[in-house]
Structure formats: structure tokens, C-alpha cells
Amino acid sequence: FQFVYQVYLKELEANQDVLAPAMNYEDILRNKAAGKISSVLTVEDGVPLDGKMERLEEFYQKGVRLISYTWNYENSLGYPNSKDPAVMEKGLKPFGLECISRMNELGMLIDVSHLSDGGFWDIVKHSKKPFIASHSCCRALCNHTRNLTDDMLHALGEKGGVVGINFASQFLNEGSNDTDIASILRHMQHIRDKAGIDALGFGSDFDGITSNLEFRDYAGMPAILDA
């Protein structure tokens, strides 16, 4: 974390004419008024927490405002999504449950993308604040363990959360390596129907996917809104 954090600070300094950190909503409004893009520091995978609450406090002080509970492996918070039903059913570990209340108090977002189904439902049960799935799609449309079921979408919407649609083809279309706007729209419409229009977001994962994309970067995203 420390190495990546230093890289982050250097990027902010090198691009300070167009980029500024945001710790809260007021910062976002201030940056927008100044004509700058807001950068919100996030952490994907709770491994760096190492089961220590003081690490969570440290991350918050450094500006982290969102943590994805897991990536592809078990950690001190809980378990990842898995093709193994026994793993998928596992809920959060005691430290994972403890972090929910503290993150709620601090105003840190919990991200459930990559989390086991059991862990997801623990978040629903115990979180008093909205949470998000930063880069996930709909399991009803593409049966992948990384995607959310209709019940999950409904629960997330009820909590006031957001689903960032992932542009990776394996989460949009089974058996295809192509990502097209029509597939993205299909998942957008399903999320709208099951979670509500306020739950719609984009979680492209451009830096982590190898799909054949109809557009290659953020410059092409207005085409989705025009479709």
C-alpha cells in the first residue's frame, strides 16, 4: 500500500492543474468549480488491512474512502466469489463484520464486487449505510459468480447503493470475448428494473480486461448514452 500511495501522491502533484483529491462531497463540488477532476482514493482487496483496525484508521487518514472487501482470494475480512458453492456460502469473518460498523462511522464505502454471496448478505444485514458493487453485472443475464443475482440487485437498491457495470465480456455475455454497447445496455436496463435507476453506474475495469471492445477507453463512453 505504501508504495502505491506514494505513486498516487506523485500523480496528483504531476497533474495538479487538472486533478485534485476528494475526501468528501464538498471537495468534489469545490474541484468541479475549479475545473478539476476529482480523484477518490480506493483500495481493491482488504489484504493490506491485515486484520488490524489501526490499518483501517490509517487508510482513512491517508484519504482512502472505499475498500473492496476481497479480490480473488481469502483475506482477514472474508472470502471471494467462487465456483465452489461451499466457498460462496461463507460469510464475513469477525474482522470483516467489525469493519462494517467502523467504515459506516467514518464514511468509507464498502465495495462488494469480488465478495462471496454469503459475505454480500452479511453486508446487507449489518451495514447501516449504502454500499456499492464497483464493477459487477447481472447474473440473470450472464451466469458468472462475479455477477449479482436479482435478489442482490434489489437489496443493494434498497440500501441506496450503486452497481458499476463491468465491461469485461465474460461478465456481459457467456461464451463471447466481445464487448458491445448493446450488451452493456441490456445489463443497464436489468439493473434499472431490479435495483432502480439511481443504482446505475459504470465500473468499466478498462485497466484489467482483455475483451474485444467496441470502444477502447473513456472517450468512447458517450456512445452508450447516445444509444
Where are each of the predicted segments found?
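Active-site glycine-rich loop that binds ribose-phosphate moieties when present
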Residues: 89-98
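N-terminal hydrophobic targeting/anchoring segments and the immediately downstream early-domain regions
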Residues: 1-86, 90, 143-202, 206-227
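Short loop/helix-cap segments at secondary-structure boundaries that form the rim of catalytic
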Residues: 59, 123-126
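Substrate-binding cleft of carbohydrate-active enzyme catalytic domains
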Residues: 98-112, 116-123, 150-158
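Short, surface-exposed alpha-helical recognition segments that flank or form part
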Residues: 94, 111, 179
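Glycine-enriched alpha-helix->loop->beta-strand junction motifs that scaffold or abut catalytic
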Residues: 64-66, 105-108, 126-132, 158-162
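Generic beta-strand/beta-sheet core signal
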Residues: 113, 134-136, 166, 203
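Acidic, glycine-rich loop-and-beta core segments that form the ion-binding/anion-interacting portion
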Residues: 117, 125-131, 135-138, 144-157
